[in-house]
Amino acid sequence: SGNKKLLLSARANSPRVNFCSSTPENPAQPPMFCMLLRKRIGGGKLVGLRQNGCDRVLMLDFECVNELGDTVMIAVVCEIMGMYSNIIIVDSNGVIIDSLKRVDLTMSSKRLVLPNIKYELPESQNKLNLLECTALDVCTAVKNLDTEMPLNKALLRTIEGVSPIVCREIEYKVMEGATNKIEGVLFDRL
């Protein structure tokens, strides 16, 4: 409760959304997108969070007051997808007000991210949602991949919303567990 500092980052090497206790130093001349965010949601109240499954797209719903004094809903869409990360401001009709990174036809033939067009979610990758599947479902999907690849890469292609670092950690834990079991069996036989 109370006011909190919200950090939104679309940097390719560290995209994230989180509350922070310290206030980062602001640049002397804020970027245009920052000024637009301040204008549209400054003083607004965060009233909802939405996410499609476990996909790495988070929608922050703000109740704000516009220039005319009317209460309006504005969504700030945070697409946390590595080098394709973006932050998009969307009005209550689902129309893009603006985005940190504009995407036109020269950059993508699949999806435009430009002012005054309807916002569309990134194309589904048809991965497994960990909240709706079992460990057996994941194992089966990994086993059914048609190529041989390291476990961390197979997990990344199979599970929705996980980052490469999480997949590497899962692979490490699986290998550590397998090594401990093998060592235990060998010790028991000695």
Locate the predicted segments by residue.
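Phosphate/anion-contacting hairpin/loop surfaces
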Residues: 2-190
